[in-house]
Amino acid sequence: MEPLKLGNITLPHKAVFGPMAGFTDAPCRRLMAEHGAGFTVSEMVSSRALVYGDHKTVSLLKAEPNGAPYGVQIFGEVPEIMGQAAAAIEQYRFDFLDINMGCPAPKIVSGGAGSKLMLDPDVCGRIVEQVVQNTSRPVTVKMRKGWDADHITAVECAKACEQAGAVLVAVHARTREQMYTPGIDRSIVRKVKEAVHVPVLGNGDIHTAEDALTMMRETGCDGVMIARAALGAPWLFERVNAAIEGLPAPKEPNLQARMNALRRQVEEMVEQKGEFVAMPQARAQTMHYMKGLKGASALRRYCCELSHLEDIDTLIEAVFDQQRRAADADDNREIPFP
């Protein structure tokens, strides 16, 4: 099996971790890399903020050695400013630069950035050209199927990006109009793969190893990008990698392993950001670890109340207690959190 490459960078695996605002900080990226993510990417950062030297924005670039290539994702709608942003961060430690052409958030598209760029493939190409000219790192692009049902432009945008120097394209198989509603169109990933010569990643609704194999089999894509499904379940990468590489499926982590991962992630968040900043962010992170547990909705409500690091121990104790009580009850009814 040919390895997946970003320019001169060879990835360890073909399943990679996609960027998500508010989630893919350094502790989260480290956890995913340890479980086999082929690369990780920062939260998206504003090109304008980078050019103006905003310290809060620059803090999002923080890199931690984690054994996998690390990319910085930037967003913006003005080619020249995107190029200036690429130049402004040359001094920082990262392996590749990713351009956001897929974010569907209203506050991003209202300014003309994110998936709004896909309405104009020429602008997409000019942005990539400016970034390539101003960085020494390989440049990748994350995009969607298109803007809406009347503007399916992924193929045109991908070709423009490739011509301008992008070395990889990741395609989320929904339009911006669809946001994250159920149902993806894998055929758009196949069409992009057939239209360009650079590696293509398929993205969207990859929750299991079989989902990943289906994406690769039906589209011919070179790898898969997993994002939301890996939150609270970093071991998903181990299962997907094993399936892609034809290896035996790894064992499912037990509850203790899951809670150990949760605690370590939150501890590192507090260590890096301080409790006041980290704990509100940890509420959303910890909710994902409740997936599949008995009484999960009650446990998620408790996650919303986390304020101090020691609250994590109380949460973990509650998780174990909830599962014991559910097992004793021997049914699937939710047991109210005390």
Regions inferred by a protein language model and the residue ranges of each:
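N-terminal small/glycine-rich loop or linker at the start of catalytic domains
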Residues: 4-16, 48-69, 103-111, 128-140, ...
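Hydrophobic faces of well-ordered beta-strands that scaffold small-molecule active sites
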Residues: 15-19, 40-42, 70-74, 97, ...
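Alpha/beta catalytic cores of nucleotide-metabolism and tRNA/nucleoside-modifying enzymes
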Residues: 1-4, 11, 15, 21, ...
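Glycine-rich, positively charged N-terminal anion/phosphate-binding segment
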Residues: 2-7, 20-95
